[in-house]
């Protein structure tokens, strides 16, 4: 029986939808050690993120990515927000002890990328 992996998704655009679909479909294709749980999603617009959550099956929403990153019930933070936000979110998620999936580009330049790793 796979163990739950609680996902916190930041961003609800094309890549947020793509990743959400992948989380829902992956167990149908692969024998996974972990089962993705759509625990929370986050965006600044409360109405839009609530509609996104209802459509994709997320359990809860946040409008501040910092709150999502600090939540104890989130195991992995999936960063699908605008490119210029990746660095700050990824560093905060790492400091909070989360697993991180960051959409490309990882950073805006090599200096930012080095700061992240």
Question: Residue spans of the language-model regions?
Answer:
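Beta-loop-alpha module in the N-terminal Rossmann-like domain of NAD(P)-dependent dehydrogenases
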Residues: 45-47, 56-117
